[in-house]
Amino acid sequence: VCLTDRTTGMPKSSLGPVIDNVLSGSHREVMAVRGIVPPGTLRRVLVAIPQKAEYEVGFYKWLEHVCRIGEQLDCHLDFYAHKETLPYICGYMQNKHSSLRSQYTEMNSWKEWTRLQEQTGKDTMIIVVTARPGFISYKPEFDNLPYIIYKKFAHTSVMLLYPDQWGDPQESVYVFTPNGSAVTRRPRTLKSWFKQILTS
C-alpha cells in the first residue's frame, strides 16, 4: 500500500480507499508498507509500540511476524515501548526467539517515537504498531501517521502494522493478562517476502 500520492508525492489524507475499506471492514492484522530499498538490504528494524499494545488480542501474532522478519533478513530488532509493555516483549523473545539480536528501550510517551528519525538510514526499516479507533491502544495521533512519515521518514522504509482486533470496538473484551503465542532469507520481492512471513 502506497502511503503517498504517486502523482504529487504528497501524503494522502488517509491510507487510501482500499486499505481504509479493509481496516473498517475487518479486524484482521494489516500491514501497510512503503519500501525504499529491497528487503534483503535491510540490516536493522526499529519497532515503535504504543502503550497498552499488550492488551490487544493480536499482540503475540504481530510480534511473531516481526520476529520472522528479523530472522529472514538476519537483522537487528530494536523495540521501543512503554515500561509496562516491554516485559511482555522481552519474555516472548527469550522464550521463542532467543537467538535473534534484539534491544529494548523504554518509550513512555508516544510523542517520542518521531525521535527514531535520528537512528534511521537506507538500511533501516521502522515498523509503527498502531491500532484502529475505539480499541484500547488507539491514540488520536495515529490519524497523522501518513503525514509524519512523509515529513520525517522520507528516505526510510516504513511499515504501519494494525494488529488483530476482534469484535465491536466499543464492546470488545480485552485480554488483560496477555496469553497465547499468537523461511528462506532475502526473498526477491516484497510480495514473496510477506507471503513467507504470514504463511510459514
Predicted regions and their residues:
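Short glycine-biased active-site loop of nucleotidyltransferases that positions the nucleotide triphosphate
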Residues: Q117-Q119
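Intrinsically disordered or low-complexity boundary/linker segments at protein termini
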Residues: V1-G91, K96-W110, G121-M125, A131-S200
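Repeated scaffold domains used in trafficking and secretory/extracellular systems
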Residues: K111-R115
